[in-house]
Amino acid sequence: MGPGPPRSLRGFLGSLKRLEPRRVLLGMPLLENPPENPCFGCGPNHPRGLRLAFRSEVADDGTREVRGEFTPKSDEVGWPTLFHHGLHFTVLYEASYWAALTLGGKLWVSTGPITYSADRLPRVGLLHTVSARLIESADTSLRARAETHGPGGKLCGRLDSAWRPASRAVAERAGIPLPEYLVAEMDP
């Protein structure tokens, strides 16, 4: 057999890339994410992005969290067969953002510090999960913790991050053109 999957399988895999983004993940409705979202991590139509999708749920310990799935691709490696550290960080950061947005009730931006650790990098071609929850919450600040787990539930990595409310005035002063769906969620 030659390199890569047989031609018929390659055609099938190519057709999957053209499907509409999933609306359900593990039987739970996905969190709303506009198709025009340009984000590399979670933009549902980003041509080269990770296209991460999340749902909100209650964990076994009763804590609310966001959860998603991802399968590293063969062109997303650092070391052979291992997901690139920067992309692993991105998955964890995206989950943290969605936890802040969904569980914090408004739009937040990261402020630092951010602490990233990798016990083991996710393996290419295997399904992994990412989850994030708030570990501290106040009106003007949040702390989130995200974790990735591999098959069998083994911890792959963790990211702790700090967040503050997004400000419309700060975005305007910086000249950042934001879509209305984001501006509507921001503090003045």
Model-derived features: positions:
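HotDog/MaoC-like acyl-thioester-processing domains
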Residues: 6-32, 122-124, 135-188
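Catalytic strand-loop segment that frames the active site of acyl-thioester-processing enzymes
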Residues: 33-83
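Intrinsic-disorder/low-complexity, polar/charged segments enriched in Ser/Thr/Lys/Arg/Asp/Glu/Gln
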Residues: 62-67, 113, 127-129, 141-143, ...
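A short beta-loop-beta micro-motif enriched in histidine and acidic residues
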Residues: 82-87, 105
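Short amphipathic alpha-helical face segments that pack within enzyme cores
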Residues: 87-95
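A structural signal for short, well-ordered beta-strand segments
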Residues: 68-70, 114-118, 132, 146, ...
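Hydrophobic beta-strand-centered segment that forms part of the acyl-chain substrate-binding groove
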Residues: 95-135
